From Swiss-Prot:
Species for this entry: Kocuria rhizophila (strain ATCC 9341 / DSM 348 / NBRC 103217 / DC2201)
EC number: 3.1.26.5
Keywords: Endonuclease, Hydrolase, Nuclease, RNA-binding, tRNA processing
A molecular function GO annotation: ribonuclease P activity
Catalyzed reactions per annotation: Endonucleolytic cleavage of RNA, removing 5'-extranucleotides from tRNA precursor
Enzyme class, spelled out: hydrolase
Quaternary structure (record): Consists of a catalytic RNA component (M1 or rnpB) and a protein subunit.
Lineage: Bacteria, Bacillati, Actinomycetota, Actinomycetes, Micrococcales
Function: RNaseP catalyzes the removal of the 5'-leader sequence from pre-tRNA to produce the mature 5'-terminus. It can also cleave other RNA substrates such as 4.5S RNA. The protein component plays an auxiliary but essential role in vivo by binding to the 5'-leader sequence and broadening the substrate specificity of the ribozyme.
Name used for this protein in its record: Ribonuclease P protein component
Region (Disordered): 1-23
Length: 113
């Protein structure tokens, strides 16, 4: 579970991260990363209706939240992250989703630096 201080809540934060951050995309997810100094890392999720019904979207969000908690533990400060789930994420097995997520984050962070 992500602590409140690590959750992205306002649309302004989402917009800033997506527009000015670096992007890394894979089959199941697209990740936008913006590096910032001194602030706690924050994570936000975008799971549209194209992914599936409400039950499916919530399942995808729970899975992505668990992966993001791992990222925040590794880097508790200095990174804003927006994770956008693509429709194939609804049926992706856990290991494939985890591999795509980690790879997309690594690509986006590398492009930021």
């Amino acid at each position: 579970m992500l602590p409140t201080r690590h959750r992205m809540r306002t649309s302004a934060h989402f917009s800033t991260t997506v527009r000015s951050g670096a992007r890394g995309g894979r089959r199941n997810v697209v990740v936008s990363v913006r590096l910032s100094t001194g602030a706690p890392s924050r994570v936000g999720f975008v799971v549209s209706k194209a992914v599936g019904n409400a039950v499916t979207r919530n399942k995808v969000k729970r899975r992505l939240r668990e992966l993001s908690a791992e990222t925040v533990r590794e880097r508790p400060e200095g990174m804003d992250l927006v994770v956008r789930a693509l429709p194939p994420a609804a049926t992706a097995p856990w290991d494939e989703l985890a591999r795509d997520y980690r790879s997309a984050v690594a690509t986006a962070v590398r492009r930021c630096a």
